[in-house]
């Protein structure tokens, strides 16, 4: 892409990545005239980021490609408080030691998306707001920062108003103070790093505006804010979650196979929008792909492209290759081609599992695994050639598992029909 022929704001609009923006014309003018420093904050609520964090991370990446310097703020301080924005209830307060451990793990994850290696101006950096929030005294904070905030305005912000209307408990002073802390973060980064733009999800609009106002009150300078749409699925369920799991970026929490499958199962209504959000594929190429998929009677290619692009980005070429291999062999029945590590991924979170003891019959295993509801149904499906043990159809209704059924002396894969699987782990 030729950066001289398009500005970063235009690019983000083309990819539907802007929800709100302040002082747009002035910001575009500055972005075209010089390199700026911008930041986005991530509060650690676990030891891993999840796929909901991908949009702001990739947005930071786009700004860096255009020659701007991204700062990733990890909320070691604000993460101890909890952001009440559009949350129904008070967050659990975590120990300082726990939050700091989470931050160390998250540092590696964010390094996958922005470049820390360049010595030029656009080199990214990571900061931890615990470093400055923990060193300012309460009296100093209230006198120097608190005096600029009107409680009347704060309780009328949508994020707080909805919380106050939701339940009888309302909001604690701890979480109510979060808005001041995030505003102070912007002020600190403006003073010490010359940050003039904060980006975040659309739920952060109120916090970002407060930071802009605080900087103007203290320094009489103009800064900017930009938010991206919060992703929801077409059925209004929360993006980034399945019925059982949050889709994490850490392979130990969400295996590359499950990560890949999540994107493969993206609906036709969502997939082209997600290609704009999560890949660098040109928008014209995405629109062409959409037309081609609609003209074909076969399965759309968009989901495969999306899954490949994002899995490669997060888990590398080897992670993608493994996810594709497991997918291919699992659904073609070539179980003998799966390695022990492949089975470990399936056991981690890939398919349902059931622990069983030696001597159990196939009928019992099918019931225990919930692949069938009764032994009668089990006998019927076995007789009709619908049950596979590892790679082989099993027609014996009274079949008892033997040692050769145990792959790597631990696993046996049951399949009902073509799509329903369960992994036996032998005790």
Curated annotation (Swiss-Prot):
Q: Which family does it belong to?
A: Belongs to the class-I aminoacyl-tRNA synthetase family. TyrS type 1 subfamily.
- GO biological process terms on file: tyrosyl-tRNA aminoacylation
Chain segments annotated as coiled-coil in the UniProt record: none
Q: Which domain of life is it from?
A: Bacteria
Q: What is this protein called?
A: Tyrosine--tRNA ligase
Which annotated residues bind ATP?
241
Primary localisation category: cytoplasm
Q: Which reaction does it catalyse?
A: tRNA(Tyr) + L-tyrosine + ATP = L-tyrosyl-tRNA(Tyr) + AMP + diphosphate + H(+)
Residue ranges of the motif 'HIGH' region: 44-53
The compartments listed are: Cytoplasm
Known partners and oligomeric status = Homodimer.
By which gene is this protein encoded? Answer: tyrS
